[in-house]
C-alpha cells in the first residue's frame, strides 16, 4: 500500500476575537502566535501530517505565499510582547473547542504552550449548537478553533461583522480591488498583499493546513493528490 499526502483548502484556524480585549491588541495576538510551536502541534494533534501556512491561503491558490516564518516560535519574544501590551503579570482567556478532532486534539497543547508565556487558558469543550449560536453568531468568545474549508474565502476577513471581529479598511480595500481586477495578475497581486496583511496583523493563528490523505494499492496510479472542492476526479486513475 502507498500513502498519498496532498493538500486541501481546510485551514485549521485559531480564531481570536479582535473586537474585544485582550485580542483587540495586535501585540497580544502576535504573542499567542509566537508561543505555539506549530511543528510540535502538528505532531501532537495530527500525527505529523499537515502544512504550516502562516496565513489564510492554501498552496493550491495562485496567491499563496509561505508566511509560516513571519512570526516564528519564540517564547522570549512572546513574553516581551505581552509585557509591551500591558500584561506583564499574565492574563486569563477561554478557548472554546467544538467537538471535532483537530480542535479537541489541539486544546491541551495550546493551553500548555500559552501557560509558558503567562496566559492561562480555560478549555471549554462545547457542542456545535453552542458554537454556532454563541461563538459564530453572537461573537461571545475569546479564542476558538475551527477549520475553514471554503474556496477563495479571504473575503470573510473583510466583513467586520464576521466572528473574527477584524475591521481593517486597508484589508477591505485590497479585497475590493481583487474582486474588480481586470487581469488575473492584478487579482493575484492584491490577494497576496491581503494575505500578508492578515499575517502582519496576526488576526488569527493558522495552525496548519489539513492534508488530503489517501491509501491505495501500489498497482494504482494517477491518484489526485490535492483537493480544492467536493469533487473527486477519477479519469486519470489507472490500475496495473
What does each model-identified segment do?
Residues 6-31, 44, 159-161, 175-176, ...:
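A bilobed periplasmic-binding-protein/Venus flytrap-type ligand-binding module shared by bacterial periplasmic
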Residues 19-28, 70-71, 88, 180-181:
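Short helix-loop capping/hinge motifs at secondary-structure junctions, enriched
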Residues 26, 75-94:
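Immediate post-signal peptide segment of exported/extracytoplasmic ligand-binding proteins
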Residues 33-63, 102-111, 132-240:
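Detector for C-terminal structural segments
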Residues 44-45, 68, 94-101:
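Short beta-strand->loop
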Residues 75-81, 97-110:
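Bilobed "Venus flytrap"/periplasmic-binding protein-like clamshell domains
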Residues 88-95, 112-126:
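A local structural motif
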Residues 99-101, 123-133:
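Short helix-initiation/N-cap motifs at beta->coil->alpha
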